[in-house]
């Protein structure tokens, strides 16, 4: 029975992740481009008044292109297909990634329920942290290839590397260690997962006791139940992303080809000194636009499949 439950969570997690990845891929590409240090900054001139002789001083400056500007640039120079760059390795990675995550989450929750107060916040955070650690450690090479493909800029019509070619290039130029660039930043991002699932499980428990849940048994869930879970997942991910977003920027910088960014704290220091603290939130808007519906789709699909395929409780 335990093995069957694990397989169910593996399957449900893989399906949820696949659906979410396909539907939100263009926003993933936009977010990665905005996070990158290779983003072209638009030059501006700042006028500073109040000098000793009363004259103004014109200082050169720069403005980070917005979401729509980056989207327009990609469509004009690279074509609409570039909005799906990295989808191949993303699909190859997201199904096993989500499958591993949800299977590890459900199993670790069983274990932690026997150690701490059952279904408490500590249990949810510990389970989410453990599952994220396992998933990040196993899947980082695939996410590394996906990020490199999304950062590759080629004019419309120019041949671009596929996932296998990109993986070979990374291995040839950087060796096996190259596939694990950004892993420390991914570990730092475990805090985001812990916050997200703490909020989600809390809201899920509240919804189970509220008017959104049908008054019948757990096996008679209606559309309103899953709609409520989608809103809970969206809210949880939005809060967690805003709190822990800087690690995403650091991770993208660490995965850039031939970059000056070598280690987590060295990268954080360089970004802060050279670009200011606002740079840690570059790409936040497309991240929220992508991650909120993506998480809502993934979790609600996962919950739906588990509900449909799980054996009725006696």
From Swiss-Prot:
Q: Does the keyword Transport apply?
A: yes
| Single GO molecular function | pyrimidine nucleotide transmembrane transporter activity
Ordered alphabetically, the record's keywords are: Membrane, Mitochondrion, Mitochondrion inner membrane, Repeat, Transmembrane, Transmembrane helix, Transport
Pfam families to which the protein is assigned, alphabetical: Mito_carr (PF00153)
Tell me where the transmembrane regions lie.
7-27, 44-58, 114-134, 183-203, 226-246, 291-311
- Supply one GO BP term: mitochondrial genome maintenance
This protein's GO CC annotations: mitochondrial inner membrane; mitochondrion
Q: Where does this protein chiefly localize?
A: mitochondrion
The Solcar repeats lie at 4-111, 119-206, 224-308
Q: What is its membrane topology?
A: Multi-pass membrane protein
Q: Where in the cell is it found?
A: Mitochondrion inner membrane
Family to which the UniProt record says this protein belongs: Belongs to the mitochondrial carrier (TC 2.A.29) family.
Function as written in the Swiss-Prot or TrEMBL entry: Mitochondrial transporter that imports/exports pyrimidine nucleotides into and from mitochondria which participates in dendritic cell endocytosis.
Q: What is this protein called?
A: Solute carrier family 25 member 33
């Amino acid at each position: 029975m335990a093995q069957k439950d694990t397989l169910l969570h593996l399957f449900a997690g893989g399906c949820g992740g696949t659906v979410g990845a396909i539907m939100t891929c263009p926003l993933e590409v936009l977010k990665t481009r905005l996070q990158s240090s290779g983003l072209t900054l638009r030059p501006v001139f700042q006028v500073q008044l109040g000098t000793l002789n009363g004259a103004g001083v014109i200082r050169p400056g720069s403005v980070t292109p917005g979401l729509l500007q980056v989207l327009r640039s990609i469509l004009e120079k690279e074509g609409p297909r570039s909005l799906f760059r990295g989808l191949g390795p993303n699909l190859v990675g997201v199904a096993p990634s989500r499958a591993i995550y949800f299977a590890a989450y459900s199993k670790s929750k069983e274990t932690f329920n026997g150690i701490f107060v059952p279904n408490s916040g500590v249990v949810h955070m510990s389970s989410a942290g453990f599952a994220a650690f396992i998933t990040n450690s196993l899947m980082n090479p695939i996410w590394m290839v996906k990020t490199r493909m999304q950062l590759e800029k080629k004019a419309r019509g120019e041949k671009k590397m596929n996932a296998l070619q990109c993986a070979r290039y990374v291995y040839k130029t950087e060796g096996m260690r190259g596939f694990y660039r950004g892993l420390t930043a991914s570990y730092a991002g475990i805090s985001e997962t812990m916050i997200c699932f703490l909020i989600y499980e809390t809201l899920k428990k509240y919804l189970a006791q509220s008017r959104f849940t049908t008054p019948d048994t757990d096996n008679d869930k209606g559309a309103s139940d899953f709609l409520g879970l989608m809103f809970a997942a969206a809210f949880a991910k939005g809060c967690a992303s805003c709190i822990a977003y800087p690690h995403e920027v650091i991770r993208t910088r660490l995965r850039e080809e031939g970059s000056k960014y070598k280690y987590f704290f060295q990268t954080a220091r360089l970004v802060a000194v050279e670009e200011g603290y606002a740079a840690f939130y570059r790409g936040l808007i497309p991240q929220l636009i992508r991650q909120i519906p993506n998480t809502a789709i993934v979790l609600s699909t996962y919950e739906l499949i588990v509900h449909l395929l799980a054996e009725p409780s006696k």
